[in-house]
């Protein structure tokens, strides 16, 4: 997993009805093994095939259908995200932008949009 080597990631959310953009900087912990079993049970049966393609996704194959889907809980992971900062941008006649950081105990600051 690339996230195990560099656990920093970004989550970006766009809420079109309210014209709000949310950006979060996170540190990701990848959980695998038995701890994921309760979460695996919540994955719909027809969606589990995404966690067992053989050969692995991205592998060169001889023909378009030269692969199998066999669900495999061992290839399932749970990502736990520790939010480090949140940036909000509200679009409107006058845009509003704010930034909150865990390192400042979530005390916000206004930013120029």
Each predicted region: which residue ranges?
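Charged, gly/pro-rich active-site loop segments
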Residues: 20-113
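A short mixed-secondary-structure module that forms the rim of ligand-binding clefts
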Residues: 1-19, 27
């Amino acid at each position: 997993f690339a996230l195990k080597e560099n656990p920093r990631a970004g989550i970006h959310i766009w809420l079109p009805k309210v014209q709000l953009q949310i950006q979060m900087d996170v540190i990701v912990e990848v959980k695998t093994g038995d701890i994921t079993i309760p979460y695996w049970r919540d994955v719909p049966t027809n969606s589990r095939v995404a966690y067992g393609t053989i050969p692995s996704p991205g592998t060169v194959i001889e023909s378009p259908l030269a692969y199998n889907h066999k669900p495999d809980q061992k290839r399932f992971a749970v990502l736990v995200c520790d939010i480090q900062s949140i940036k909000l941008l509200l679009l409107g006649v006058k845009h509003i932008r704010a930034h909150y950081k865990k390192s400042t105990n979530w005390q916000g600051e206004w930013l120029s949009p």
